[in-house]
Amino acid sequence: VIETLQKQEKVQLIITTHSPNLASKIKLGNLIICSGNNAFPMGKDYTKLKEDSYVFLEKFLDVTKSNLFFAKGVILVEGWAEEILIPSLAKAIGIDLTAKGVSVVNIGNVGFDHYSKIFLRKNVPFMDIPVAVVTDCDVREYELDGNEYERKDNIDSERKSKINEIESKSFENVKYFVAPHWTLEYCLNLSDTLKQEFQKIVKSIHTRGGWNSDFEKELARKLIIGKLEKTEIAYKLANYLDSLENIPLEESDTICYLKKAIEYAAGN
């Protein structure tokens, strides 16, 4: 009905809803998000979205992703592993994302700009909904040298430069949280808190390979050739986290970036 009415001329239709299903059927430019004491129109004159983003979002904003319009906080991720793991990690550090009204939205590999700029305004007032963007730094720490995968030398400056480049995209209420090493999985393997359980799970899923001789190198090889079962690993690690309470995550832990993203989106 909504889609039909939107095609008619000289008809003004006003709908108030908390339904992501209905919101996903309305043209993005016609939406108005009410937050606090302000109303934020989503039209082209108000947001920092480009024309192609409107076209893209009207095609790909499904019911699940439309949850972000009703959230008190948003965490944007680019893969199933993060989407599965973050709610369980949040619970393990004492934050209930559901109770806080935080939505974790998996945008896949389409780029964050399409989604994050929904929340960026051309003029004041700016939106007060915290948006945490969680992403990998994607600087490989191993490379193929002949027939062997070897650790790259002197990548600290390259990694730091890439992280700074990504974090510089933070603006207004949108903040980027970047994996300090390569990918989520690589950071899990370096984590003081979860390394042991992560390695146990990986070995239970990938029963073949040189895990016992050099786990890090085998992990790097799997990441490079795209053969790591990231989703299954995340499910099992999430189940493990669900059994924990108040786990310590120090600032130096390589997955602390996830904790910071959770805290930011939850308003902690």
Predicted regions: what they are:
Residues 3, 8, 23-268:
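Acidic, divalent-metal-binding catalytic cores of TOPRIM
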Residues 9-14:
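Loop/turn-to-beta-strand initiation segments
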